[in-house]
């Protein structure tokens, strides 16, 4: 079923302290006396599945499933151009920003935050007011010479960022009880997913249109061509429902095979398993971006990875109620597509030296089972190597969006778990 939710925002401790509310949410404000949330999520991804179950005898099973899913995954948010930041908790609007420079303003803002709810939420009416008095003419609009569009150019809009998936896959598992003490399972799967990343104008907030240009490139470069998000339609005028900003697909394909052998003895059970996988992912750009005109549109280079994994484990029965369990595994896996690309919204370029992650893991535990009480104590350890750490943020000194990536990141998780 479709899911629509309003999202809470993350604020700094100063905001929570001033409001006296640890659940303070900066994402909403009053419009015409009614609450409106700028951060809404929209999720609707139906799935269709066909399964076949084959059991030729009591010791054999062969199950196969074919599935298809598609849908919408969107999240709305405010965007603005040549205008003040509309977020009430923007750090320059907080009292602490003026603590050492303007004592009177510092005290006034503290009082406003404590007593005036409107001062700490989005001012929707002000956004509509700003958009309604910004008459602007776009010359050669949409790349058509002599085409002039005149109207109120929105300084603020509500946009929806989308990541709409289409996924098709098949899974097949064959299971055979070889005898009273041995069991074999083998299987394979194939998955293909294409995710469409783009954004649309959800609400012009009282304006007539939005001009589809990169505001950071527009500020940093004198060449207006560089600031065009769509070089095939320069000076693109967009209205409600139109796609703008970025528009591309990420395709992923995975072929996997696996097997597991299990053996039982009187006081012990053990298993070994292995898997092989071949994966590939690539980008397809739908627009030619002004920053990277030769590396943004069309099908990009495929990134291929071959991976494998092995595992083993067992249980030793000390008595009928006390057990020792141990497991160990090694596997390699391809990097996630959301961290593999440098700036997928505007170009087809992956991080230099991209390679598979390696995962080592193991655990050993003691298990006790009584009729009314069950308990477990487990020591675990895992090490993940060659990860990619990726973050995007606005840099105040550089006055631009920064894509920050680190490669070769290792991570260790270890600890003790107790459960009763």
Briefly describe each language-model feature range.
Residues 1, 62-66, 184-188, 270-274, ...:
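Transmembrane beta-strands of outer-membrane beta-barrel proteins
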Residues 157, 183-319:
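Signature of Gram-negative outer-membrane beta-barrel scaffolds
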Residues 68-72, 190-196, 265-267, 276-282, ...:
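Transmembrane beta-strands of outer-membrane beta-barrel pores
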Residues 33-38, 47-51, 155-160, 173, ...:
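Extracellular loop and loop/strand-boundary signature of outer-membrane beta-barrel proteins
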Residues 2-23, 79-90, 94, 200-211, ...:
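Flexible, surface-exposed loop regions and adjacent strand-edge segments
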Residues 2-51, 74-159, 223-238:
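Acidic/polar loop-and-plug regions of large Gram-negative outer-membrane beta-barrel proteins
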Residues 48-54, 64, 170-176, 186, ...:
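Residues on the lipid-exposed face of transmembrane beta-strands in outer-membrane beta-barrel proteins
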Residues 167-171, 351-355, 361, 370, ...:
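Outer membrane beta-barrel strand-and-loop segments of large Gram-negative receptors
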